[in-house]
Amino acid sequence: MTIIADLTGTTATGHSSWESDARTRASRLEALLGDPYDPANPHGLRALFAADARSAPPAATEDLLAGTDLGAEFVPVEYGGRLSRADLLARVLRPVFRRDVALGFGYGITSLFATGAIWAAGTPTQRRRTADLLLGGGRATILHHELAHSNAILRDEFTAGATPGGYRLNGRKDVIINAERADVQVVYARTDPARGPLSHSVLLLDRARRDSPSVRHLPRVTTSGMRGALFSGLEFTGHPVPGDARVGGPGEGVALALRTFQVNRSLICGVVTAAADTVLHSAVRAATTGRRGPVARRWHKPLAGVFADLLACDSMATVVLRALSLLPDRAHVAAAAVKYVVPDLLRENLEELATVLGARGYEHDSPQYGALGKLVRDLPVAGLGHAGTASCQSVIVPQLRGLAEHSWFQEAEPPPELFRQGSELPLLDYRLLGLAGGGDFMAASLVGSAARLASYRGLGGQIAALAELAEGFVTELRALCEECRRLPAYGTATLTDPAVCVLSDRYSLIVAAAAVLGMWEGQDGRDPFLANPAWAVLALSRLGERLAMPVPELPDGCLAQVMEELVRRFRTGRSCDLDGIALAQ
């Protein structure tokens, strides 16, 4: 059964009440963190880069965040927290990630990743105690097998053998973020030696259960990126865990991982784009410093192109994060697609921006230009490296044949509120998140967008180009549909088959195109730039080139319009995302 929760109205300002509150908190946090380029700011980029160089957390900034009760952002509103929707959480966290990815993970977001299983399947007591812990400034961390991200940091495994009173936990993991600082640990442990969907269970360990002779704390591990985050290890040897520490049913660990990681994947992509925004500002600074006239024409394509890509990334992440509230049983494939596409786009974007920054990109301690090198190091450690691709493919590939046979070109479009910023959406409820089936609302949206734009084809100008691009992506979806219908039955296709991997590549880029079109159509006209098709045309053209599909020539003035907006946002101190918020200066 498809779940579409009831929608309520908006405030007089045109924004939902939850959204207005989130905007206020994000603006307050941005102001508290202050001008990132001020060398005297203890929370500015110079101070954060210095802490990173020392491989130390930025203590002053962590204290500042503690004073904002940031932990409340990770607690559902029904338990006294501020977690209303995932898209609004991303908005609140962006001021932190705009300055330092390691700070965003090390201080805050890891607690949400750890406690997602508790919000999804915990007992009332587990949920209440966890909420009280986070609301009181405590932290949680997560210990799991590589099923989470397929990241090299997450390869060790824990086992938990059944005992009359619960479990005996064994295993070692050398690289765990906040292993020493966390007040609770959520462990994904193998409880069944057989391979299969019921192999793992989730255990909740508090500090009292952790501090015992059967637990050994391992030394801190140095990482190439996120150097200010504290990674260390834990080893359990016959550690007793009571039965009431299990979260959910026995063998429910894999299902809980698949359900909760769709929030994690989408949220990471929604906040890390803010860090890339900082690098884009650095590149525009490099291209404009010392020039009285306009930016040199040779920099228009990379700068405007990266800006369009960031808007595409934000569109994709925002749509999926909103879907977690509006269509919670249908968002799992789109969540994997966003995690598949956004890291690749960001890596390519950083390479393009490096050409603009030139030698300035090597000024690693410079607040104006040092963000590039740090983000290049941080992204892989944050789970946004090449290693994370396989876990997304493992979600997408098994669904493709079923989507081709039963969903594509057959399913109704999603509610328009999915794409309308300011619409009131249901609260995020982890208990409603699905992990299989449910159709493909993004493909349906793409087909609908193309149909509405069809009458503009051949008329010339940007709207005609947008219509041509939309139809081009529908053509790609139709071709993909035919190929996916020929896939072998589920379980016989292998992720090591390059042809299968290419199908997930193509599908994920089509989802990105659908998000761009949906967000463009959902504009209410209050932002003239976003209501104009120029940014969407440029974003779709770049996505189409990655798909090697026929792409029309950019209409006259398209690149210039996007470039003009980028320079305007740089000079007026505004973010390069869909919100275009005022940044601290």
Regions found by a protein language model. Give the residues of each.
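Amphipathic, small/basic residue-rich leader segments at the start of a protein or domain
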Residues: 1-108, 129, 434-495, 504, ...
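Glycine-rich flavin
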Residues: 48-180, 197-198, 325, 388, ...
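Glycine-rich beta->alpha junctions and the first turn(s) of the following alpha-helix
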Residues: 223-311, 419-515
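Generic structural signal for well-ordered, non-transmembrane alpha-helical segments
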Residues: 274-277, 301-314, 336, 340-351, ...
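Extended amphipathic alpha-helical segments with heptad-repeat/coiled-coil character used for oligomerization
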Residues: 320-416
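C-terminal structured domain segments
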Residues: 504-562
